[in-house]
């Protein structure tokens, strides 16, 4: 080879942030196969409602799958990605969510950890065994879904949450989800169809896909949901306010109405865990999960790197400062700068800390603490109202 000069363009020097698929969700739904077009247990990526035609899915052969996708794209713009995963109608939620034998695990693996949330729906059949106010399968699926999401987090470094369709609601008392410990799983009750055996999970997924990670699906400024009618069981939402309140108190997500506002809104974004859990809401879950992914990507570049140490085996000060700054910069660029974290006066929304006393030379292990600052939310507003009058006259 002749002597030469070769100049390469460097990339990644400006600190810009690439697209993050925070709203990439999967819809797992009981369905019927369509010959040569739709296979069960196979993932399909959609970008519009019309793409269902190519898969042979109609309101006649797959009414619930068709409805959920249609609902999704009434909230999300055409072009928004949605992964659909049709499954055997006979499979229970408990079977689907099993981290060892369930097919949703195969979906998560096949999508290479890209999914941020999974919405699980049945095919609309009547619930056969109902306890605690809902299909019993729902409650046995809750721990399975939690274990599945935890597996994705620890094994694939791909944290996600799961929303289960609250099947079989007939009014009356329900199990209190605030007494559970499933901070990666939520339950939706309520549909656009009267006396539905399922819930409008497509609608919820579509709304959530349009929002940044810190934004609550119940935020009034988001605007009303697109459907002109929504139901809790057999009653319209506006005629079932007591059920909406009771379900909210028990930790379920439902649609609601506000006096003076047209349309429907979600009540909140509760997950099936104690209200004191740091991750009791989808907003907290999505926020910290995004920080998790950013931290993993940043730290991966430092794996097996050489580290300068002091005589006692502890890290040199410069190394500690570099690691802390690297972590904070990565999160602040990707999240604080885009308004997804609550920034302090210096414009930072996170803090990284490396313990300077740890002996890295003997353990080859570095323990780092990363804390991100979330937003507060106006859930309860109390106003003291009275007359303003002048006294002494």
Could you say what each language-model-derived stretch is?
Residues 47-48, 82, 87, 93-94, ...:
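Compositionally biased, low-complexity/repeat regions
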Residues 1-32, 229-264, 347-351, 364-370:
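Anaerobic metallocofactor- and corrinoid-dependent redox/one-carbon enzyme cores
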Residues 61, 133-140, 279, 283, ...:
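Catalytic cores of large soluble enzymes that bind and process phosphate-bearing ligands
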Residues 1-172:
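Small-residue-rich
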Residues 115-249:
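Conserved, well-structured core segments that form the ligand-binding/active-site neighborhood
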Residues 10-12, 30-33, 49, 87-90, ...:
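Generic structural motif
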Residues 208-322, 369-393:
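Long, contiguous, structured domain-core segments that constitute the functional module of a protein
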Residues 296-354:
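Extended, compositionally biased non-globular segments
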């Amino acid at each position: 080879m002749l002597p030469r000069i070769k100049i390469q363009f460097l990339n990644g020097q400006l600190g810009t942030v690439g697209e993050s698929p925070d709203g990439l969700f999967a819809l797992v739904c009981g369905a019927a196969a369509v010959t040569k077009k739709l296979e069960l247990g196979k993932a399909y990526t959609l970008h519009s409602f019309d793409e269902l035609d190519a898969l042979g899915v109609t309101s006649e052969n797959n009414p619930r799958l068709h409805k959920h996708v249609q609902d999704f794209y009434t909230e999300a713009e055409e072009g928004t990605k949605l992964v659909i995963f049709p499954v055997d109608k006979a499979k229970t939620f408990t079977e689907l969510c099993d981290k060892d034998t369930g097919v949703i695990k195969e979906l998560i693996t096949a999508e290479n950890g890209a999914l941020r949330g999974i919405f699980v729906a049945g095919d609309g059949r009547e619930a056969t065994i109902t306890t605690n106010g809902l299909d019993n399968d729902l409650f046995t699926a809750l721990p399975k879904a939690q274990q599945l999401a935890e597996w994705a987090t620890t094994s694939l470094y791909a944290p996600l949450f799961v929303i289960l369709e609250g099947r079989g609601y007939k009014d009356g008392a329900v199990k209190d989800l605030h007494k559970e410990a499933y901070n990666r799983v939520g339950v939706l009750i309520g549909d656009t169809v009267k006396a539905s055996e399922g819930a409008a999970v497509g609608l919820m997924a579509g709304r959530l896909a349009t929002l940044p990670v810190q934004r609550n699906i119940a935020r009034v400024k988001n605007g009303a949901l697109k459907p002109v009618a929504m139901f809790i069981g057999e009653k319209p939402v506006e005629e079932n306010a007591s059920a909406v309140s009771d379900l909210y108190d028990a930790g379920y997500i439902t649609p609601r109405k506000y006096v003076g506002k047209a349309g429907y809104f979600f009540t909140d974004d509760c997950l099936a865990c104690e209200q004191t859990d740091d991750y009791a809401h989808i907003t907290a879950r999505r926020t910290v999960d995004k920080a998790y992914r950013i931290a993993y990507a940043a730290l991966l570049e430092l794996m097996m790197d050489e580290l300068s140490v002091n005589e006692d085996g502890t890290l040199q000060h410069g190394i500690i400062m570099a690691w802390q700054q690297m972590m904070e910069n990565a999160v602040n660029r990707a999240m604080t700068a885009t308004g997804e974290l609550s920034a302090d006066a210096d414009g930072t929304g996170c803090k990284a800390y490396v313990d300077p006393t740890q002996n890295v030379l003997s353990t080859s292990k570095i323990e780092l603490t990363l804390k991100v600052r979330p937003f507060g939310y106006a859930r309860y507003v109390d106003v003291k109202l009275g007359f303003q009058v002048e006294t002494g006259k």
